[in-house]
Amino acid sequence: MTEIHDFDKSEWDIKGSIAPIQPTTYSDGRLVPQVRVTDPGLGDRKDECFMYMFLLGVVEDSDPLGPPIGRAFGSLPLGVGRSTAKPEELLKEATELDIVVRRIAGLNEKLVFYNNPPLTLLTPWRKVLTTGSVFNANQVCNAVNLIPLDTPQRFRVVYMSITRLSDNGYYTVPRRMLEFKSVNAVAFKLLVTLRIHKAIGPGKIIDNAEQLPEATFMVHIGNFRRKKSEVYSADYCKMKIEKMGLVFALGGIGGTSLHIRSTGKMNKTLHAQLGFKKTLCYPLMDINEDPNRLLWRSRCKTIRIQAVLQPSVPQEFRIYDDVIINDDQGLFKVL
């Protein structure tokens, strides 16, 4: 049984949207580098120099003898660094990087990124750029199947997204807690609906709401659980959620991210599951990579956030992690 509770628009109205990166080109057709700065916080951090950096660009053939052939559009999350440089200065150095891209495979397909030239302004992000980093291919590339293996590839930076970390603490919930299930508990999740504003040309955006596509994603917050074997009612859980005083914002962590701040009283069990933190960040890159890629450059606006209450462990379902073929019986065997 699923119960849905709508949050009031005022709880995300201030910072519930992200500005677009409008593509403009040079006379030869090359994209003009741009930087976008987002601040989803409330500004209570004393040091304002911490920021999250996310690069967008083209994966193309690294051929010095001829014009590069673009293969796919990709991203490179650099993570958090501390810098007093201007965004335009950081963008200029990023466009001068020589980032090598390699396509590999493990449990799934992955992309490897590493940079060759020395760094100056981007030194706070040297660990990712110099040592190299590996990402699931679908998280950072819109068409990994088009990237060849027999031709050297490079990542040419075109856009930069900076998210200022002005809140006093940004925290990601431990992954184990996101998968934690408990009998006789009520799972508290959020269903977020975004409206995507499409660019139809330089400086032009479709603003007619009837023509705009929508994207939804769901995040797991935690579980309401009683000490006894009884289960909380949906009305009781809704009351607890209202007392939390949740405020929502959109940021650019990993592309697009949902930022949540509790300004009220939080259920003790739920608070413990969240690491006793009241400022949370859920990157869409980890939650649902398809809409995240769609939103890399688009303007998006939050139009609805709903609390979803579901049984923590549905009794009618079993959860299987792996399915293999049993050679002895010639049948599928579930482990």
UniProtKB/Swiss-Prot annotation:
Function: The M protein has a crucial role in virus assembly and interacts with the RNP complex as well as with the viral membrane. Associates with phosphatidylserine (PS) and phosphatidylinositol 4,5-bisphosphate (PIP2) at the plasma membrane. Interaction with PIP2 triggers matrix protein lattice polymerization. Matrix proteins induce host membrane deformation and curvature necessary for virion assembly/budding.
Lineage of the organism: Viruses, Riboviria, Orthornavirae, Negarnaviricota, Haploviricotina
Name the UniProt record assigns to this protein: Matrix protein
Superkingdom, natural source: Viruses
Signal peptide stretch: none
Pfam families according to UniProt: Matrix_Paramyxo_C, Matrix_Paramyxo_N
GO cellular component: host cell plasma membrane; membrane; viral envelope
Primary localization class, coarse: virion
Gene behind the chain: M
GO biological process: virion assembly
Keywords: Host cell membrane, Host membrane, Host-virus interaction, Lipid-binding, Membrane, Viral envelope protein, Viral matrix protein, Virion
Protein's cellular compartments: Virion; Host cell membrane
Subunit structure, as described in the record: Homodimer. Dimerization is critical for virion formation. Interacts with host ANP32B.
Entry's family note: Belongs to the morbillivirus/respirovirus/rubulavirus M protein family.
